Every structure is written in structure tokens, then in C-alpha cells.
């Protein structure tokens, strides 16, 4: 992406917000203080009514749009969605991207130094949930004197975080856009997460999560976890279209080396991810996914759980997403309608599987553009 494009955010930089008030977590643990790394795009208007919070997915972070001056190839993960003239138009909205608590891109997490020990938190960093993140979003908004977000938007785990905030702080959210998400993980999804965790936990370099002091990193386990996850983010059709049974070298080698293009692709994705992500954070994020279940305290009644919500909702799903299928989005829509809340829903034709929410798609983007254009400030 050229930084000169008219619809580009251009050069951006990350900032850091510090919080000294102790944060009580759902696990019972307490963080005496913490920091959140964030980026903003656009300008906060005079009455602070145009703030939009972007919630990231498992492997995402605060770098949602734009590029860095010292690394112009590092484009924000939702750059096709956010910018001047884009579906989330920064000429109208003040957009905020936050690296969640427990992340590994600057916010307080397992790789951070524990002031009490002088060492990295590592495995001692407490598990965090979407409810804990919702608390941090509210505190962040308070620091900016933002009484209410014009919209909270997220895909996948980010969609769950958006729902959580709309439920836990209903007076702070006017609109919630939930994309490719679910109100709870299925048993199959929990199983996928556990297999990914086991790949990391059983890596000899994991050292019970204290690999920092051993000078190691469970790269093999993290690599396998990412490869498994990536398979679930794609669809059979997209894999067939992109790779089929194509061989790297044109003929069978009759050995156990990487032969098929799909194998090469997965190895590349795994290697790249293992170089950039922290294993303890990966474990933590998968547990946040597993634990998300707003109906749990309501005897499994999702409609009762959503009785707290006040926001208007846009819920989007993708036809080929088998990780978070359209049926799961329809469960959310039903719960919202049961509470007579305003909700719009669309099931978007796509062959790209769960990753569709990150893709450039005219129909998908037009739906979000139209919804955002109708938000009055």
C-alpha cells in the first residue's frame, strides 16, 4: 500500500496508556497496574461522540490501519476497512485500536516485567477473559473522556469482545458490529484450541511457560498451533482453488519432505507466526475464546443474557465459515430480537472461510459502509 493513496491512513505510530488503579480479574487475580498500547486514526470531535473501538482477534493487535515510518511493509491488519473514504471512514470517526491486556505487542502481558519479581510474568500472568478486556476498554474510554462509543467493531474473538462490552457496559456502546463470531464456542472449537495448546505445552522448549529464563522459545509448538489454526480459518473451496494438489517441484519425491503447495503454505504461515508471537499469549488468548459464554450465568439462556444490551447491532456471517458458522450468528440475532433490540443481519456469500472477515469484498464492505454512514453523531 502506498502511503500516498487518497484513502490511506498513511504513517501511524503507537502510543501507551498507563493505569494505576488495580484491576480485579474474573479469575480472582488482581493486577496492581497495567499498560495498554494503542493507535488512533482520525480526530475526536468536540463532544467526543465519534469514537469507534476496534477489537482484535486472537493473533491481532493495536495496529489496525496505516503503516509505520520505519517499516512501511507492516500494514495494519484491517487497513482495507479503515481510512478516509473507507467503510469505517476516519473523516467522520475517531478510530481506536488497542492491544488487549495479555497481548504480546506492548500491552501488559506474559512477556512484560513483573515489578514484584523483576522478571517476566511468563506463566504467572493470570488468565484474562473478554469480561476483563471490557473493563479495560471502559477505563481507556474514561482516560479519553469518552462517555460512549459510537460503535464497537470486531471480527472473530474481536466480535466476542464487542458483544461483551455491549453487555457489561451497555450505556457505553451505541452500536455494535459483530462479524464472524459466536455467542459461545462449540465443542469442536474448544477441541481445536486444546490441540493447539497441547502442541505448545508439550514442546520441550516450553519449560512450563518459563522459557524466557531458559533462553528458549517453544517455536515448534507455536508453529504447529498456527498451522492447525490456519487450516480452520480457510475453507475447503478456497484451499482447493488456491492450491489444489499442486506439487512444489512438479513430481512426487517419495519422501517426507514438503511436497504439496498447501504444505509449503502452512509451513510458511507457521514459521512466520512463530517468529512474531509469544506462546504464553497464544495460550491465554485461546482460553479467552473458550471461556466466552455470556449465557453461562443465565442457565444457558442467551436471550436472558442479552437482556442487558441497549446498543443497535449489525451481525455479519460468511457462508463458507465453518469455524464460526452462520448458524452461530443467527443465534445471536435471535437473542437480540427476543429483547426487541434493533439488529441488522446479513449472511455474506464467500469462499474464503473464517478469514473472510479480513478480506476485501465489495458486498461485505458496502454493508459496513452503509451502516456506519447511518450512525448519527
Swiss-Prot record:
Q: Where does substrate bind?
A: 226, 355
Pfam families noted in UniProt: Abhydrolase_1
Q: Where in the cell is it found?
A: Cytoplasm
Q: What Enzyme Commission number(s) does the record list for this chain?
A: 2.3.1.46
User: How is this protein annotated for GO cellular component?
Assistant: cytoplasm
Residues the record marks as site: Important for acyl-CoA specificity? 323
Q: Which residues form the AB hydrolase-1 domain?
A: 50-358
Q: Which UniProt keywords apply?
A: Acyltransferase, Amino-acid biosynthesis, Cytoplasm, Methionine biosynthesis, Transferase
Give the pathway listed in the UniProt entry for this protein: Amino-acid biosynthesis; L-methionine biosynthesis via de novo pathway; O-succinyl-L-homoserine from L-homoserine: step 1/1
Mind listing the GO molecular function terms for this protein? homoserine O-acetyltransferase activity; homoserine O-succinyltransferase activity
Q: Name one GO biological process term.
A: homoserine metabolic process
Identify the Gene3D superfamilies for this entry. Answer: 1.10.1740.110, alpha/beta hydrolase
Q: Which residues form the active site?
A: 156, 321, 354
Q: Which residues form a coiled coil?
A: none
**Catalytic activity line of the entry:** L-homoserine + succinyl-CoA = O-succinyl-L-homoserine + CoA
Job description of the protein:
Transfers a succinyl group from succinyl-CoA to L-homoserine, forming succinyl-L-homoserine.
Q: How does it assemble?
A: Homodimer.
Under the heading PANTHER family, the entry gives: HOMOSERINE O-ACETYLTRANSFERASE
Q: Which family does it belong to?
A: Belongs to the AB hydrolase superfamily. MetX family.
In Swiss-Prot or TrEMBL terms, this protein is called Homoserine O-succinyltransferase
Amino acid at each position: 500500500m502506498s502511503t500516498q493513496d487518497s484513502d490511506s491512513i498513511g504513517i501511524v505510530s503507537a502510543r501507551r496508556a498507563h493505569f494505576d488503579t488495580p484491576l480485579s480479574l474474573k479469575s480472582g487475580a488482581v493486577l496492581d497496574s497495567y499498560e495498554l498500547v494503542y493507535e488512533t486514526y482520525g480526530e475526536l470531535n468536540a463532544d467526543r461522540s465519534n469514537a469507534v473501538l476496534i477489537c482484535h482477534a486472537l493473533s491481532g493487535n493495536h495496529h489496525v490501519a496505516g503503516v509505520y515510518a520505519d517499516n512501511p511493509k507492516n500494514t495494519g491488519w484491517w487497513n482495507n476497512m479503515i481510512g478516509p473514504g473507507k467503510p469505517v471512514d476516519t473523516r467522520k470517526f475517531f478510530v481506536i485500536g488497542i492491544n488487549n491486556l495479555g497481548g504480546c505487542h506492548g500491552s501488559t502481558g506474559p512477556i512484560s516485567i513483573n515489578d514484584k519479581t523483576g522478571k517476566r510474568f511468563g506463566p504467572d500472568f493470570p488468565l484474562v477473559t473478554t469480561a476483563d478486556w471490557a473493563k479495560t476498554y471502559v477505563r481507556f474510554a474514561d482516560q479519553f473522556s469518552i462517555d460512549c462509543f459510537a460503535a464497537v467493531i470486531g471480527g472473530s474473538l474481536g466480535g466476542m469482545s464487542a458483544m461483551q462490552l455491549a453487555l457489561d457496559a451497555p450505556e457505553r456502546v451505541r452500536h455494535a458490529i459483530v462479524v464472524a463470531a459466536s455467542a459461545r464456542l462449540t465443542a469442536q472449537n474448544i477441541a481445536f484450541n486444546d490441540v493447539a495448546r497441547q502442541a505448545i505445552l508439550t514442546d520441550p522448549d516450553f519449560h512450563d511457560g518459563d522459557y524466557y529464563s531458559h533462553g528458549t522459545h517453544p517455536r515448534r509448538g507455536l508453529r504447529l498451533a498456527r498451522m492447525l489454526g490456519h487450516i480452520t480459518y480457510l475453507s475447503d473451496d478456497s484451499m482447493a482453488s488456491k492450491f489444489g494438489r499442486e506439487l512444489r517441484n512438479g513430481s512426487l519425491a517419495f519422501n517426507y519432505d514438503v511436497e504439496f503447495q498447501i504444505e509449503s503454505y502452512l509451513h510458511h504461515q507457521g514459521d512466520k507466526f512463530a517468529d512474531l508471537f509469544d506462546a504464553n499469549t497464544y495460550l491465554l488468548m485461546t482460553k479467552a475464546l473458550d471461556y466466552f459464554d455470556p449465557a453461562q450465568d443465565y442457565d444457558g439462556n442467551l436471550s436472558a443474557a442479552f437482556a442487558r444490551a441497549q446498543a443497535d447491532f449489525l451481525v455479519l456471517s460468511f457462508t463458507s465459515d465453518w469455524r464460526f458458522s452462520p448458524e452461530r450468528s443467527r443465534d445471536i440475532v435471535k437473542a437480540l430480537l427476543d429483547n426487541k433490540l434493533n439488529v441488522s443481519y446479513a449472511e455474506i456469500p464467500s469462499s474464503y472461510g473464517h478469514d473472510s472477515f479480513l478480506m476485501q469484498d465489495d458486498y461485505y464492505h458496502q454493508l459496513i459502509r452503509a451502516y456506519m454512514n447511518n450512525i448519527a453523531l
